[in-house]
């Protein structure tokens, strides 16, 4: 009996699919102000490796951001037992902090990379995609920075996240900056010293001038390093720490209120400082929060896979 002849169109489609699965690797990167997280998958979706590297905030420089991205990609390949030459097989989505600024986004798009293809978007966009599995919704990122993002009926909305010192209220970096401001207030006699403030000034050898010099060159990540201590002292009853956490939460409440006013059916709160802030949020905010379906890395993988599919379609 002669074998059944494969339909030519179906055969070509199957061949393209097999070639795509063999040749493309999918990489999703969530590049934030403190660290970058990456996940490498086969085109089929099979997980190959995860990795963590340094920050990838475009406001701190395109070169530094791509260095962190490449560190994570190389680590993924190493952990997956694959040669570094496979960088050229990767279709990536780089979801980077600072990519919402047009100039920084264009500079990132022009930057050379070793990947087969790379789409660049904001970390907030990827977080929103991941949190709601591509469905309509809003997300608030409370990490080193703070920004709100919504995907509603095919449109995107961004609130806040313009960066320190002008924005990012409620973020870890903002809390750290405000805590040091209050150290100077206490030094000037404008407010009373508290255990938190005395510990912070001790970090600078009790010298307010050292604080001023340090802040002139400090990055958001460095400011944000003080935020966990503020949260710890707030739980212990320190009045300045409590005031800072309440004020930070009020800023996050404001972002949530704006997302709800835009029509977001549900909200997700994510980011490295989200857990510390959640107990301080208003009930109106917490009542709208849902458990994220996925994270920003998952959202980035969704976009990377769509890009790989488009490459397959034109092959």
Predicted ranges, named:
Residues 2-4, 10-88, 130-138, 180-315:
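ATP-binding/phosphotransfer module of carbohydrate and carboxylate kinases, centering on a glycine-rich
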Residues 91, 98-193, 315:
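Phosphate-binding/catalytic loop of phosphoryl-transfer enzymes
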Residues 93-95, 199:
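Short catalytic-loop micro-motif centered on adjacent basic/acidic residues
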Residues 96-98, 262:
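N-terminal loops that bind phosphate or other acidic moieties
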């Amino acid at each position: 009996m002669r074998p059944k002849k494969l339909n030519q169109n179906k055969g070509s489609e199957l061949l393209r699919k097999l070639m795509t699965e063999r040749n493309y690797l999918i990489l999703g990167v969530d590049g934030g102000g403190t660290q970058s997280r990456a996940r490498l998958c086969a085109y089929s979706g099979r997980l190959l490796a995860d990795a963590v590297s340094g920050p990838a905030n475009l406001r701190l420089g395109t070169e530094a951001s791509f260095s962190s991205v490449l560190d994570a990609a190389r680590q993924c390949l190493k952990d997956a037992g694959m040669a570094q030459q496979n960088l050229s097989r990767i279709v990536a989505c780089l979801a980077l902090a600072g990519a919402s600024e047009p100039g920084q986004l264009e500079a990132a798009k022009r930057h050379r990379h070793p990947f087969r293809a790379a789409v660049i978007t904001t970390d907030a966009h990827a977080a929103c995609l991941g949190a709601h599995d591509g469905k309509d919704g809003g997300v608030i990122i409370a990490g080193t920075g703070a920004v709100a993002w919504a995907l509603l009926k095919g449109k995107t909305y961004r609130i806040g996240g313009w960066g320190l010192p002008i924005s990012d209220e409620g973020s870890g970096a903002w809390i750290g900056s405000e805590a040091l401001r209050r150290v100077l207030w206490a030094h000037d006699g404008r407010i009373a010293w508290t255990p938190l403030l005395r510990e912070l000034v001790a970090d600078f050898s009790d010298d307010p001038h050292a604080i001023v010099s340090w802040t002139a060159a400090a990055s958001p990540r460095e400011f944000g390093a003080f935020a966990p201590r503020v949260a710890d002292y707030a739980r212990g009853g320190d009045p300045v720490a409590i005031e800072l956490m309440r004020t930070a939460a009020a800023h996050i409440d404001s972002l949530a209120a704006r997302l709800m006013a835009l029509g977001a059916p549900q909200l997700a709160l994510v980011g490295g400082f989200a857990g510390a802030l959640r107990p301080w949020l208003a009930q109106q905010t917490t009542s709208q929060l849902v458990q994220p379906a996925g994270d920003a890395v998952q959202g980035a993988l969704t976009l990377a896979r769509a890009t790989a599919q488009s490459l397959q379609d034109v092959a």
